[in-house]
Amino acid sequence: MEKNLAKTYDPKDFEDRIYEMWESNGAFHAEVDPDKKPFTIVMPPPNITGQLHMGHALDQTLQDVLTRFKRLQGYSALWLPGSDHASIATEVKVVDRIRKEEGLEKEDLGREEFLKRAWDWKKEFGGKITKQCRKLGDSCDWSRERFTMDEGCNKAVNHFFVKLYRKGLIYKGNRLINWCPECGTSLSDAEVEHEDKNGMYWYFRYPAADGGEGVVVATSRPETMFGDVAIAVHPDDERYKDLVGKNVILPLVGREIPVIADPYPDPEKGTGAVKITPAHDPNDFEVGQRHDLENLSCIDFDARMNGLAGKYEGMDRYECRKAWVKDLDEAGYLIKTEEKVIPVGECYRCHTVVEPMLSDQWFVKMEELAKPAIEAAKSGALTHVPERFEKTYLHWLEEIRDWCISRQLWWGHRIPAYYCQDCGELMVEETAPHKCSKCGSTNIKQDEDVLDTWFSSALWPFSTLGWPEETEDLKYFYPTDVLVTGYDIIFFWVVRMVFSALETTGEVPFHHVYVHGLVRDAQGRKMSKSLGNGIDPLEIIDQYGADALRFMLTTGITPGNDMRFKTDKLESARNFANKLWNASRFVIMNLQDEDGNFRQMADLTDLDKAALQDEDKWIISRVNDATKYITETMEKYDLALAGQRAYDLIWNEFCDWYIEIVKGRLYGDDEEDKKVARAVLVKVLKDMLRLLHPFMPYITEEIWTYLPKGEADADNPKGFLIKEHWPVYSEDLCFPREAEKLEMAMNIIKSIRNIRAEADAAPSKALRAVILCGEGRENVVKAGERYIKKPANITEISFIASKADVPEEVMSAVVPGAEIFIPLDDIMDYEAELDRLQKEKKKLEGEVKRVKGKLSNEGFVSKAPQKVVEEEKAKQVKYEEMLAKVCDRLAIVEKKVK
């Protein structure tokens, strides 16, 4: 191995090597250890439908930061990885591939052959996903990797289904469901995305059967009129009291339907009368149930009109809409049209408009399951970070309807329901029955449908640990500690995991839900294929390194909020890594002799604190304070604040200050002091690497390998940073007096540098400083005087007692506890300043003249908006004040030049 880090920071030189070292040495493996506390995160399983996107990179980085943090704290930290079969999404992809490569439909292949190709897809893309996770630095326990359709998960799914069925919580019924005509399957309510779109309301007259005027009804879906079975009005709506109980005629169709009274219609909306089509609207379905109305379907599962639509049979629903409205208009039934913004439900996968349809499907009764999940949040057993997402969680549970869990697909967990083909007996069993439980026939057929993907994902936190078996992993690692997830799948996944866990294990699946936002592009738009603004994390890693990407993501996001992906933030993160690299090279170089052996260092454990210089105590106290802050913010999931504090500590305090101060000692003649300086450098650098490791694991581990090793640890025989111990805050490492002294000196240095920059004076130009201190501060400044002079290039510091003693013609700056004055004669190049001020005067005179000209123009003052006129008046005042100051300054400088 080389004796020092490479001269140039290039993550490609070591990131893959470091990851292979970790994995081959079992650094990610979590043991069931009664002497340690467990910490568990289950990875939200990415779909096997392609490669990871930037949202996955964020999600996984946050989880890895927490896992590495807890591992360093001494927990047996398990991050359990896996992937999701993603029933609809994967089937769509596989069907598309078969069409393109084989020119076939899935029905041409048959179920068995199709599933072979789906499993081939899983092998291909599942492997790609795990490779991408490894590139990111995910410290998952790959020995426990799971898949939502592996044998263990399938066993858990069947067990859960049968358990709910036998409790009466799963049933099969003919109910209204969401149907995607494109995917050819039912969808749960959570899988329907609602979006407001510009639409139309058509107002049609339904004539009274007795020859009266009847009633006018507004609808946004006239094509469903063929399925109308009633007109509903509110019982308190006086306009329609005489119509209730009578019949009206369905226009052009001629069928009579009743007018009924029901609380559903809103008298203030439309005409107050609502057409009731139970087979094609969920609200109408509920009305139909209350009034025992017939369910008439006029649209088939391919979104085409059926025989109930008469001459429109076979037409697409939207083609029918146009033709039907045209015919109604020509027949005189269309009263008016009205443009409206209408909420439209779309399939979350293909974005086809969903059709409410009556269908025989499997459902989960949700009322009983939802109650414990609601109580878990209200009692504090389950907390959300940030807290506001608890309202979202509770709202969804309190408004929940029965969950449609059957899907008309082939890829997924097949429903464990079996039908006797001879007597029709239904059997729900964990394993396929050999014969009918009623008639003994062996002619048995399994239900063709598969389960909703989220049914198996709902069991993920405990099925992955061996449930329903009482495994050692389940006993030790469950319940898990935190679920890290985006706010976009609280409905889909989080809620279902909670009620499933409470029903099966009696415990919440995790104690905390850390909710993060989305990664948007630089303009704040959601990343998508259609916009072409998606960013491949692997390309970013190739260009900047995984550490830079991870640090940018963790420090750029706050819980629950979206973040914008900006290249300059990546550049900043990479620059930070480069700064740490170069500082570490300097430290390592000064630890070694000419032969590459480590020089002697003081033993800080037994060292008399008197041997430490003030700057040593200051940096040790700063690391100690940072340890406390970073630990506390990490525990609260404020990862951005923790990462930023690590950045400030390393860049601003260690690199910019401590290293610069300590250089003189390292190059000096006092050998004992050198030993102390080396020891402090090593201690501080090691502690900072520990603090930064969860965020930037690769660079910190690489630097760690070049530093002196401590005593061998049974838990970490090879001395890897990933298995080290997290720093612990100690009151003994607080040095308030020395910290005050150094920080006062640093503030003074920064103020002098700012004065130099303002005066355009070179750093090499020696200056004198006059300081007016606040009460009790002069001794502090004097004690730190030796730290000020060299970095600020100050030859002399003098102290004054009051403002009356301030020299004439100075530039000044204020810092906490003191005011600093630099004589103009020291800092100013009067010839250059004279030239600058003359130019500034000329420019300001021009601005004053321009504004005065505008304001003296009566046409401008009378015609321009009052706001614009006031703005110009304000500009005149500002420019005149600036000109007066420049003229005063010019007079002083002119005297100096003369």
Pin down the residues of each PLM region.
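Short acidic-hydrophobic surface loop/beta-edge motif
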Residues: 202-209, 246-251, 345-349, 418, ...
